[in-house]
Amino acid sequence: MTTVPLTDVEDVELTLIARDVSDLLRAMLGPKGHPDAGSLIFPTMPLMGLVTEESFHYLSNAPQQSSLQPLPTLLFSRFGRAVTKTRARIKLFDDTDGGADGLVEILELAHSRSVEWFREPHRGPIRSLIRRFQPDLGIFFVGENLIASTHAVLPAMGITLNELKDFSSNDMERLVERSFAFSSEVGVYLGQLATFLHQLGKRVELQPEAPDIRDLRVSHNDFIGANVYRLALYSFRPNEARFVGAVIMALAHINAALYVLPRLLGVKSNLLLRFQLLTAYHAGKTLEASIPQILPPISEAERTVLRSRQVRNLCAHFGLRGAAQTAMAAEDPFGAALQSLISVSRSEVEAVVNQWLNTVSDLLTARLSKSSLAPCRAWLGSHS
């Protein structure tokens, strides 16, 4: 079949995709050899889902005569649902697969499965005494700031609600193996994508320069989950007690967007700005629904940036759509696309979103931080 050359729109869209792939690889490979490399992978999980799924959809939906074509990958036949759910966790209450009720249910189930898993070895009349002090929740911090929890990581790994319902202790033991297989398949797909983009004249940095993160340290404390949620419930006083896990997850996304991903991706990364805007949009809506009394009011100018459905769609998808004509002629296509939608420059967008993220992080961290959680640490846990 005869193919046609890239259109001008495809050319700029592929340039942006190649940059995002390079940035994702930088975030995935950069921590190699870092003492906290295992913990730094948690904040990048939604980005893996976003870049892989959106690039696959972009190529798969190209016209039949286009130079673009879907890649022959096993990622989506083996882990398609996991990719979708990994990417969807950034949506929090806005996830179309269950909404607020679905997120609450999977977080509660992740908690109960963790309790069962960690208590499993301690059966019998004597060892059962240990169970009272057995941790079932790990929380990761950068400084005082909570960036991830193991209860939220389970669904963020792409494990669905139905899968988690059927999980046994043996399945939990195999999570590391599953995670490795998933990450390996993501790596294979990104290599295929980089090769294809190179054939179209788009360069992907397969061995990007490692970020300087020597001073970025992640600490870890173990807890009995019920004690943490009791303290968080008292501190946040959400509209409904069942929302407390979602509030903690939103805080983790916000802090990852502020304290981890800028170091891994670079502060001028389009992929970073996508994540920060998506976090402000979805975490903002989730927190407005759960703890509105804590959030600061936002002005109409801020709302234009933080609650724009058009901006959300531009960040969540790889096609430029109505913003393409403006983006094609610009030195910064992504910034130009944003400005064409809301008449706000990229620098102003970055200032607004960072101010909101910092303000909300400060307000929530004043109520839930490494120091405030210290009295809840499990006696039998691991702490750093």
Where are these regions (language model features)?
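Amphipathic alpha-helical interface segments
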Residues: M1-T304, S340-S384
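Histidine-centered, metal-coordinating catalytic motifs and their short helical/loop contexts
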Residues: A301-Q339
